Amino acid sequence: MAVTETTSEGWFSRLGGAIKGVFAGIILIFVAIIMLGWNEKRSVDRYNTIDYAKNNFVETAADKIDSATEGKLVHFNGMTATNDVLTDKDFGVTVNNSLSLNRDVEMYQWKEIEHKSTKKNAGGSTTTTTTYTYEKGWASGLINSSSFHESGHDNPTVLPYKAEDTVAENVTLGAHKIPSNSASHLGSAEAVALEADKVTAPVSAIIKGNTILYNLYKEEKAQQAKKAFEANTNANVATTETTATEATATPEATTTPVANKAAFSAIEFQASEAAPQIGDIRITFKKHPVCNATVVAEQKGEEIVAHKTPSGEFYEVRTGLMTAAEVFKAAEDENAMLTWILRGLGFLMIWGGFGAIFKPISVLADVIPLFGDIAESGISIISGLLAAVLSFGVIAIAWLFCRPLIGILLLILMGAAIFGIITLISKVRAAKKAAAPVPAAEPAPEQTPAA
């Protein structure tokens, strides 16, 4: 079932909010400029660090520690290894020959989906219609149902277990030690095959594959039922033992066997895989087995550490058997990708900042909704153009400090682009003016001859 709410905001209220947004827009642009400048410096420093590493690394064997390469940037690869036995402290799940043991926890809960639509009214006010719908699904964290707009969609208030990673502390690659924080992410995750008799699981849990499944509410009932069952069974056994003792004391009595304790069955309290219910908890286990890995880092005895260069630190531990050239290429690609992502983010921030600065104009025009829509479209285009020019300019200026020649070239390109755009606009305007029909001249008034 859906719940719908309708709210209205007056024109003066919208205008006041838009004026306040101007200050937020200025701050957003300022932050974006700083981020763009920092990103260019970071990118150049990382490029120089990788370039330095390319020209100053040495090859070394993985299976021995060479004193000749102590303190140098070295490249080696091979199979990782560990003797650590990783154990989940809550469920007793254990794995060998693994770099990490990962536990994921999800709960089946209600989710509130919000959909908004806003309509502009004559006079500048707006009417917002918000629709809330509800659906069930798996979530890794608790969803607070007390804030839902419709009652009857109650979620549990506790999640007994949380996601947790157990990592191997003693990992080696040949004769070299690999830090646990580097080793734990190597390789690909694999499902852990759980053995029911070796797992400490809730009473009503279903254990299948790498998953433990049970219902939070049903588990409480299962535990209560188990306690009652065990208490009743213990009482019956005690009565049987007493009767057997008395019978043994009578010479003519026959021997009465002592009853065995029956096993408690929690089938009726189990969750359903096919039809999950609110409160179902799904716990899955995965591991990262030992695998081939490649290192380019500084050798410090048996350990590897980040190698300091004039422009930064270089430290790479990657999955697979890779040449040094492949490691450097991967590092360069990652640096380029991050650089462009941050450039794009900076551009969007500046675009949004200019949009906020010009927002009062569109709100003023919203007195007539059609004019407001036209103004909003124009503001979006202008804000985008200004954002492109400003972000490009910031990047160019940043390069002036890092690589002056490249910075100058970028500024020249930016100036040429701006000049080209202005020239094109001028030509379009001139062409429109020339194509416009020239109004016909009015005939001169006839002169009356003098008498």
Indicate where each model-derived feature is located.
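Alpha-helical transmembrane segments forming the membrane-embedded cores
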Residues: T7, G346, G353-A451
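Low-complexity, intrinsically disordered extramembrane tails and loops of integral membrane proteins
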Residues: M1-W11, N210, A235, T239-T254, ...
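Short extracytoplasmic
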Residues: N55-F91
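Hydrophobic alpha-helical transmembrane signal-anchor segments
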Residues: S13-R42, L345
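Cytosolic-side membrane-insertion boundary helix
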Residues: F12-R14, F314-G352, E376
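Soluble non-transmembrane domains of integral membrane proteins
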Residues: M79-A81, V85-K300, I304
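Juxtamembrane amphipathic/hinge helix adjacent to a transmembrane helix
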Residues: A2-T6, V317-F328, G384-L390
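Alpha-helical transmembrane signal-anchor/signal-peptide segments
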Residues: E40-D63
